[in-house]
Amino acid sequence: MKIGILSQFPELYSTRRLVAACESRGHEAVVINTLNCYMNINSIKPSIHYQGQELTGFDAIIPRIHASVTFYGCAVVRQFEMMGVFAANDSISIARSRDKLRALQLLSRKGIGMPITGFANKPNDIPDLINMVGGAPLVIKLLEGTQGIGVVLAETKTAAESVIEAFLGLKANIMVQEYIKESNGSDIRCFVVGDKVVASMKRQGPEGDFRSNLHLGGCGEKVKITPAERKMAVAAVKAMGLVVAGVDILRSNRGPLILEVNSAPGIEGIEQTTGISVTEPIVEYIEKMVSARKSNRAVIA
């Protein structure tokens, strides 16, 4: 097969590991900078051009769309889909997961556990908003934030009101969430491919920081997840419509709670922490899906 890896960063560990996994299974891997693609949108033969040439012959793509280029990245993935190319994560699912509010609403619709979350537009909603999620301490998040950036823990009601007022005054979109104290600055990252959790690790934030993101100096360790956590991780990915995703879970007194579903999860941290390859299962899944599509086309023909 010819597999395109949509990534702005060919030198990244994640990109290099995906290339290696494709090549080790006998496939051709081509790294494509998403932002350098340009599209011919028509009703007869939609196409994508790159570096002066039309991209042809691809069986599948693995989107690694950075959050900052979600709009254009999804457009490129959508164009590949229009060309009949299988996408490991499709454009609609990526867009769903990147909209944090929409993602939580989808999880809520499916009855999947999560921290109590509030969202508001007007400053005069603040007191009731804080009470709605259980009062202080509480977590305030920018909807556009990634990797723990734009996340604030407000220890008191006064601090919470001040932070919320400041964000709303800047016309920033925020949500507030109950603080799960018993998680103690840690979460569980589950790496899901299809309907399986292929690897999982516990992430612990630096001392004094409630955020567990490895990019912020947190550390990871291999962890055995419970059947309930495994079931919830797979259900969350399915609710988004994704195939490959990282699911962040908090362990609370009322059971596991979904914090986030990431459509382009980091690979380096979980592979180096667990010693498990997460890229091989991705390529194996693509092989299975592309083969099934070809078989279906043959039957129809």
UniProtKB/Swiss-Prot annotation:
GO terms for molecular function: ATP binding; metal ion binding; ribosomal S6-glutamic acid ligase activity. Residues 104-287 form the ATP-grasp domain. Mg(2+) 1 binds at D248, E260. It comes from the Bacteria. Mn(2+) 2 binds at E260, N262. The keyword Translocase does not apply. InterPro entries: ATP-grasp, ATP-grasp_RimK-type, ATP_grasp_subdomain_1, RimK, Rimk_N, Rp_bS6_RimK/Lys_biosynth_LsyX. GO terms for biological process: protein modification process; SOS response; translation. Binds 2 magnesium or manganese ions per subunit. Pfam families: RimK (PF08443), Rimk_N (PF18030). Keywords: ATP-binding, Ligase, Magnesium, Manganese, Metal-binding, Nucleotide-binding, Protein biosynthesis. Coiled coil: none annotated. Mg(2+) 2 binds at E260, N262. Its cofactor is Mg(2+); Mn(2+). Mn(2+) 1 binds at D248, E260. GO terms for cellular component: cytoplasm. Its EC number is 6.3.2.-. ATP binds at K141, E178, Y179, D187, R211, S212, N213. Belongs to the RimK family. This is Probable alpha-L-glutamate ligase 1. It comes from Shewanella sp. (strain ANA-3). The lineage of its organism: Bacteria, Pseudomonadati, Pseudomonadota, Gammaproteobacteria, Alteromonadales. The gene is rimK1.
